[in-house]
UniProtKB/Swiss-Prot annotation:
Source organism, top-level taxon: Bacteria
NCBIfam families in the cross-refs: PRK05339.1 (NF003742)
PANTHER family membership: PYRUVATE, PHOSPHATE DIKINASE REGULATORY PROTEIN 1, CHLOROPLASTIC (PTHR31756:SF3)
UniProt signal peptide: none
GO molecular function: ADP binding; ATP binding; phosphotransferase activity, phosphate group as acceptor; protein serine/threonine kinase activity
Catalytic activity: N(tele)-phospho-L-histidyl/L-threonyl-[pyruvate, phosphate dikinase] + ADP = N(tele)-phospho-L-histidyl/O-phospho-L-threonyl-[pyruvate, phosphate dikinase] + AMP + H(+); N(tele)-phospho-L-histidyl/O-phospho-L-threonyl-[pyruvate, phosphate dikinase] + phosphate + H(+) = N(tele)-phospho-L-histidyl/L-threonyl-[pyruvate, phosphate dikinase] + diphosphate
Residues that bind ADP: G153, I154, S155, R156, T157, S158, K159, T160
Functional summary from the UniProt entry: Bifunctional serine/threonine kinase and phosphorylase involved in the regulation of the pyruvate, phosphate dikinase (PPDK) by catalyzing its phosphorylation/dephosphorylation.
Protein name: Putative pyruvate, phosphate dikinase regulatory protein
Entry EC no(s): 2.7.11.32, 2.7.4.27
Keywords linked to the UniProt accession: Kinase, Nucleotide-binding, Serine/threonine-protein kinase, Transferase
Organism, scientific name: Agrobacterium fabrum (strain C58 / ATCC 33970) (Agrobacterium tumefaciens (strain C58))
Family membership: Belongs to the pyruvate, phosphate/water dikinase regulatory protein family. PDRP subfamily.
Amino acid sequence: MENKKSFFHLHLISDSTGETLMSAGRAVSAQFHTSMPVEHVYPMIRNQKQLAQVIDLIDKEPGIVLYTIVDQQLAEFLDLRCHAIGVPCVNVLEPIIGIFQTYLGAPSRRRVGAQHALNADYFARIEALNFAMDHDDGQMPETYDDADVVIIGISRTSKTPTSIYLANRGIKTANIPVVPNVPLPESLYAATRPLIVGLVATSDRISQVRENRDLGTTGGFDGGRYTDRATIMEELKYARALCARNNWPLIDVTRRSIEETAAAILALRPRTR
């Protein structure tokens, strides 16, 4: 029988695409087989206003914070705020930059995204990342037909991290929460361009992830129904029926990593063209 895994929040903050952070976070997370990260990815964070909004989200769902921000004032602001709310915060690149500076006897350029060549592929990824952030969690439904992929699913089926992962590969991705008896936007049904795909998981997996969210939430949140397995099963039944009715493919993410889920979505795309 498979051991029950625990979940923790992993916040990844980058002033560029976030790809470096995602690779580092997953490489380390893979060393801890009994715990699985709930990833929160925040790319293109380049000013204090954006960073303050991210910190508010971290405060609601505390966990490990990894970041790659070359602006030292922003990095110090993040460090101070994370210390104030009691969460660990690590600048992933800073120790490496320090070693390079010492060995080479020269300061770094401190340039955002310096590891990326400024070619068409890079700009396509930036455009896709901006699109994914603008269309996260049901936002901007009027432009769904501009998407390459639209992901739908109930809460805690990895919609956002999958969207960001696809965006890092230049795939414009929107995601929409599925809530029983709440109609999806008409613009989704009218869209002819994107692949629309549903994500599901077992009720046990979703309940475990939601329980972790509940524990990290300060007052005013009634997690009873949110984490109740019977309620989750009804949500999943509704989502499955919705996808079946519209001939939208379903992917079960229970035992899939974000990379595997994204690969499964990409494998479906040629059939839709």
